[in-house]
């Protein structure tokens, strides 16, 4: 039955993406190509994160969630995420990765992923693990 719950399916994919991101972070110093890989892993992880939030909110009866900004705001209001400003900064970084490529910007985003965003993803994973365990 749990396999039919969309947010849990999405959460499983989020975990896989987060594990991939962790490999880049654990590596430490990255080559230019690896740094580009970290940005891609961040993009995938971010997309799966906000979509997991959206799916969970819809599963819980919430509506009017049209994009990541709505999902983040509502997720913060309901305690799914604790650092709303951090998630909004992450949204801004995600938008920058898809609309521009600039080495300095990429370096700044890589630094933010390692020092800030990865921790936010870990907290989100912990929250959804708790919610998933409460369901069983």
Task: Please give the residue ranges for each predicted region.
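Solvent-exposed interaction patches of small proteins and small membrane subunits
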Residues: 1-136
């Amino acid at each position: 039955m749990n396999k039919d719950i969309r947010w849990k399916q999405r959460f499983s994919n989020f975990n896989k993406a987060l594990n991939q991101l962790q490999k880049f972070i654990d590596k430490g110093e990255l080559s230019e190509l690896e740094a580009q890989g970290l940005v891609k892993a961040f993009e995938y992880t971010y997309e799966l994160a906000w979509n997991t939030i959206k799916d969970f909110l819809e599963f819980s009866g919430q509506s009017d969630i049209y994009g990541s900004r709505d999902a983040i705001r509502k997720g913060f209001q309901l305690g799914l995420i604790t650092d709303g400003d951090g998630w909004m900064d992450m949204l801004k970084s995600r938008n920058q990765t898809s609309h521009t490529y600039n080495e300095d910007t990429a370096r700044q985003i890589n630094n933010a992923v390692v020092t800030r965003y990865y921790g936010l993803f870990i907290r989100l994973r912990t929250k959804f693990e708790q919610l998933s365990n409460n369901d069983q």
